[in-house]
Amino acid sequence: MVSIDDISYAFKNYFSNFINSISLDEKLLAPAPKEEWIRRLQDCARFQASVRQEDQHVIHSLNTLLTEQSDTLTAAHYDTILKYCRKLYYANSNEPPILLDLAQKLIPHYERLDDTENLLFLYCCAGYASSQLSRIDSGNVRKLSSYYYKKVISYRDEIDTFQNPVSRDYIFIAYNNLIRIGTRAGWLTLEESYSLCQELYSIRCQKKFRQFDKSNPRIPSLCKKAIDGFLNNDCLADLEGFSFTENMHQFCITLSKKRFKEDRTKAKSFYHCPASTVFQYYKILAEEGSISWEEACEILDDYYFKKEKLLSEEIDFDHLTFYVDFAMLLISFLNKTSLPASKKKAKIVQYRLLLKNFLSNCQTVLERYTLCEGLYFATFHPLILETFENPVEKTNFIIDSVVSSHLPTMTHSVMVSYLAEAILKHVFLYCPEILITPKSHMTLDELLTKQPQVTDYAVQAALLHDIGKNGIVPVIMTQHRNLTDYEYSLLKMHPQKGADYLSDRDFIVYRDIALGHHKSYDGKRGYPVDFDNVHSPYRPIIDLIHICDCIDAATDYLSRNYNRVKSFATVMEELEAEKGTEYNPVLVDLILEHDDLYRELRFLVEQKREDIYYDVYLTFANKHVANMEHL
């Protein structure tokens, strides 16, 4: 039988490995000479490879214990596991899949005991974990968020019987996350959010609930954040596509005006008032015609930049809303004015730069799951993309703010671009006809005159092919243990996520590359299953990126797959063995039959890799440091 000491020892090791893994990752962003940085990268990979099996054993043993051997567990065993579940929850460890699985396995035991206060924690824990996952997964996990948080709220009227003060907080944590996050994350309807907001506003007036404000100082703060969150949704309705009814909108107008007067009276200055209150108030005044949109923009612009200088004084501040939502609101308000185009453009560039700088460094202030959601909402929102004058500016913005937000993905994408460019050069020399498809609508002679454009396209496609991974960074950042089956299913979503990201008219030409780079040449294997790469007009470049993607991943001796590295020669043998099924046979033969190309590719993956990685790191690290200073 597993002892309690065994469980404690396993959890402590797991936490230690997790923290050390994060620490080594963070060291990669610190300034260092090339040799030192490469050593850090190798140390990080070695460590993660060494602890992966150990941590995987902990997860497997725990799952076995709580499922197949649960009849051997005593109450003390369950309480010990619960203790570490709490530690995982409060550590903000970005391990929601593990946390959700653990909470769901513990819940039946405490439900049998009718242990209200431990159940409150576990429901809240499961609600939190599933709400975080809902930011990157649009599946059934969204329903779990609402289900578990509503379970917490169902204990609301028992609040004065709780022995542990923290249990009271859970009630209002549930309200806050349902109202503030649920609607935007897609797991709560606007009508449900409105009903809960009214309910919360009502119970705040009841003595039964207000009596705990002193013993539980988080309660009034959580209530205010929840209600402000609903008001923010009204403020952001045009950006989010929310359809507020007249009753909802009037509720928000009345409450916002009241909030502004109260906050203005209490605050040290106008610039110390909560940003959400200020933005909502002046938006209402402009919509009513009490002030012009030009006046509203002038007031809010002044407030925004002076407020930013005061952020260090704020406690529990919502950076994502301030830097992303409000920057986008300022742009949308500008579009309602009759200001000269040059003045609008200057301001838009200023807001956009502030937003980009924040997103480039927001891992310092945001959970990774929150970062993913914010990154997608801001970077790919039509309001932002329409502010660029040409596709090149737009593409550079995407690469700089999204692709470079995750160093391993960025280095891999750059490596793929180098490999693709090298192969494509030989394609134009020896077999350019393979680039022509029935939908190309050009002759071979016409194609040959477009070599620079085709090469530029392939390089950009390589840089953007894995952009969907930036929507699941928390999953691909998990290196201290194997991915769970659920996490792997999320990972396999990255081609579709990439295609969703690239739906803008200037990116649509890269969409099939993102969708198809994990499909086999014959279209019979790979994912997504329903994408037909064989008949895509972009098939030649899909085939090219697929081969380059596999070459780099298999030969990468510096990054995360350190313990699975293969020699270049071995990879070439695998390409030859699977040409015609997994890989384009013409491209494989091209590599194998031309020694100069073979040597160039081998040079890139074996000798040039360190230089390429370090160059990417310097760009990434310098941007990171600059944005740290700015923020």
Give names to the regions the model predicted:
Residues 7, 11-29, 46, 349-361, ...:
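Intrinsically disordered, glycine/charged-rich C-terminal tails and inter-domain linkers
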Residues 8-17, 46-64, 89-108, 135-158, ...:
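Helix-turn-helix repeat elements of alpha-solenoid scaffolds
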Residues 12-49, 70-90, 115-136, 164-187, ...:
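Amphipathic alpha-helical repeat scaffolds of TPR domains
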Residues 63-75, 105-119, 151-168, 202-219, ...:
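Flexible helix-coil transition and linker loops at the boundaries of alpha-helical arrays
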Residues 168-169, 436-462, 502-547, 561-565, ...:
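Histidine/acidic-rich helix-loop-helix segments that form or flank divalent-metal centers
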Residues 267-269, 289-290, 295-368:
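Extended, non-transmembrane interaction/recognition domains
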Residues 361-489:
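Acidic/His-rich, divalent-metal-binding segments that scaffold phosphate/diphosphate chemistry
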Residues 415-425, 487-503, 566-583:
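An active-site-proximal "capping" alpha-helix that borders the catalytic cofactor pocket
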